[in-house]
């Protein structure tokens, strides 16, 4: 999630949507009765009832694209119902609320939350992140998303590795000796 937000913070109209800043994941719904979104429920009945989509396929689709993922309770802490309510929440809480919650994220200097804070600070400090001209480098590389932003005589290099494996990349000469502004990996060398 840090890799994705790192690249997204260089988009002009970036917003943080409920739980993104904590690294909250989509909640898996295993049964149609767990959904609350009437559009999702109606689509399930309409498409599976007409035989156009198998029920298992429709559940997979709704888990990926349904709106209820964005409607689950905010995970404030590791108490019952993630600290969202002392009552019964209207929709189920994410199964990882005991570890992924605001209380834990705010206390951990290496958390997704604190990475967001650093990026937002940089975004406010460095106009190039928002207003710089975008240029994609190495569009054929399937593992790395690397691009530059240019604003006047300033240049910014953004490198995102969307794999779990370490990747080799030759940094363009213009960035030799440049300062690393932020990284979600420990610095080496």
Regions found by a protein language model. Give the residues of each.
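Divalent-metal (often Zn2+) His-rich catalytic cores of metallo-beta-lactamase-fold enzymes
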Residues: 27
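Single conserved hydrophobic/aromatic residue that forms the stacking wall/gate
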Residues: 1-6, 11
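Substrate-binding cleft of secreted/luminal carbohydrate-active enzymes
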Residues: 12-23
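Carbohydrate-interacting/catalytic domains
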Residues: 1, 14-16, 30-33, 39-189
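Short, glycine/acidic-enriched loop or turn micro-motifs at the edges of active sites
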Residues: 23-24, 164
């Amino acid at each position: 999630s840090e890799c994705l937000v790192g690249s997204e913070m260089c988009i002009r109209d970036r917003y943080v949507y409920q739980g993104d800043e904590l690294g909250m994941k989509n909640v898996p719904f295993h049964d149609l009765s767990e959904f609350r979104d009437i559009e999702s429920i109606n689509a399930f009945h309409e498409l599976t009832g007409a035989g156009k989509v198998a029920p298992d396929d429709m559940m997979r689709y709704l888990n990926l694209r349904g709106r209820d993922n964005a409607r689950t309770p905010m995970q404030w802490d590791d108490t019952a119902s993630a600290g969202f309510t002392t009552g019964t929440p209207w929709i189920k809480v994410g199964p990882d609320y005991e570890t992924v919650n605001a209380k834990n994220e705010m206390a951990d200097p290496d958390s997704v939350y604190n990475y967001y804070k650093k990026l937002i600070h940089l975004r406010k400090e460095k106009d190039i992140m928002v207003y710089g001209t975008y240029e994609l480098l190495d569009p054929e590389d399937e593992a790395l998303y690397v691009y530059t932003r240019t604003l006047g005589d300033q240049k910014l290099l953004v490198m995102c590795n969307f794999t779990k494996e370490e990747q080799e990349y030759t940094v363009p000469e213009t960035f030799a000796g440049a300062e690393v502004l932020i990284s979600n990996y420990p610095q080496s060398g």
